[in-house]
């Protein structure tokens, strides 16, 4: 039987990573967090003071840096950066890094490579449009900016990060704009993706809906 690819695309704070992890566990699929890869590159560039316009230096980084994912843990050059890649400074810069052409092309190749011959579920911005346009299940998971900001704000509160709801909402809207207007793989819904608005849905509601779609292609 051919391997199954499930693509969940959605804006920041739509709940796609939470949902993807649950479904991966439920179906025993490999979960690939494409956004975490961009976050790790963003972290490396920031910590090494590399300008986002310095394409030669960024290319060197892409050719030498080691990204590894083991379950819920993320490793950058063998160092656990799971917590660091969720920091406010990463949230504020990851969309800029993700809009750099050489970064996207390099990571798309890596995402395809690690997904090869496996049942996988990936979440991101361009999984169903660019990485795997032939994915058997494509979900476009959305929610209102206010609801997404509320979710992110609560995450920050749990981590005791000092930030206001209004700051989170502003950041969400800025990321939406950058993601949807960038030249390289802009964030758009795939023609054959199922749009699911999670604003007023529980996690279980969303998981059950997507699970039914997966059962149809098994």
Regions found by a protein language model. Name each.
Residues 6-8:
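Hydrophobic anchor at the beta1->P-loop junction of P-loop NTPases
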Residues 11:
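P-loop (Walker A) phosphate-binding loop of NTP-binding proteins
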Residues 16:
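Conserved lysine of the Walker
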Residues 19:
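Hydrophobic positions on the alpha1 helix immediately C-terminal to the Walker A/P-loop
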Residues 26-88:
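N-terminal phosphate/diphosphate-binding loop that engages ATP/GTP or pyrophosphate donors
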Residues 35, 78, 107, 121, ...:
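Residue-level signal for inorganic ion chemistry
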Residues 61, 70-71, 111-118, 125, ...:
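Small-molecule kinase domains that catalyze NTP-dependent phosphoryl transfer to phosphate-bearing small molecules
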Residues 85, 89-94, 98-159:
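ATP-dependent NMP and nucleoside kinases share a basic, alpha-helical "lid"
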